[in-house]
Amino acid sequence: MLLDDKTILITGGTGSFGHCFTRYVLEHYNPKKIIIYSRDEFKQWMMANEFPRYKDKLRFFIGDVRDYERMKRAFEGVDYVIHAAALKQVPACEYNPNEAIKTNVNGAQNVIDAALNTGIKKVVALSTDKAVNPVNLYGGTKLVSDKLFIAANAYCGNKDLNFSIVRYGNVAGSRGSIIPLFYQFIEEGRSELPITDYRMTRFWISLTQGVELVIKALAEAKGGETFISRIPSFKVTDLA
């Protein structure tokens, strides 16, 4: 099967997507190894304790996508890379534009360069609907990141390597998203939930659907594709 006996590395692997992807792959496939590449040792420790049965298949690698040399070392012996690391909170990116560019743009280029200089076979980068006609810095950095990954296919030459993108909307229940925030406000006893505009709509996808779309990309990508699933939209007031 697709991921059996394969080594997969996830950048930003201790995030919501990384948790769900790791669990899904361990339950549905027999990978050789899953490498969690992230900056936070405490989150890695917590995640390791979530999967005690699979400790022989999990490897935790402290590192930052801003650090090319560290990432290149982590990529050695890896078959597939899922690039999920990003600064994604819109206000944080607006107030810290240089940091957003370092992670979301320079980090993407580091992933590309490390993949080109090791034996990686496929790279799937996670994107967002905010990269379409971006109106904020986060969306802008992800648009640039997408362009970099698509263009990287031109540099593969005779290498057995390709780059593709998975793009979806808001991930329901992911850390920092509106659903956990609404739950927090309800637990605090608030009688009203803060909604900027009652006409707002959002496109939503579950974490599992996001993982399945990434696996579809790994299976079907030839290089340069942007995979987009059809997902429903609804008003934020309906969610509230």
Can you describe what each PLM-predicted range is?
Residues K6-H28:
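N-terminal Rossmann NAD(P)H-binding glycine-rich loop of SDR-like oxidoreductase domains
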Residues L26-K43:
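Conserved glycine-rich Rossmann-like NAD(P)H-binding loop of the short-chain dehydrogenase/reductase
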Residues S38, F61-I62, K102:
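Conserved residues in the N-terminal Rossmann fold of short-chain dehydrogenase/reductase
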Residues D40, D129, P232:
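Residues in the short beta-alpha loop(s) of Rossmann-like NAD(P)-binding domains
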Residues R53, R59-Y80:
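Conserved Rossmann-fold cofactor-binding substructure of NAD(P)-dependent oxidoreductases
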Residues F60, A100, F163-V166:
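Hydrophobic/aromatic anchor residues within beta-strands of the central parallel beta-sheet
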Residues Y80-H83, L87-K147, A151:
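Conserved Rossmann-fold NAD(P)-dependent oxidoreductase catalytic core, especially the SDR/UDP-sugar
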Residues L137-Y138, L143-F227, I231-A240:
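NAD(P)-dependent short-chain dehydrogenase/reductase
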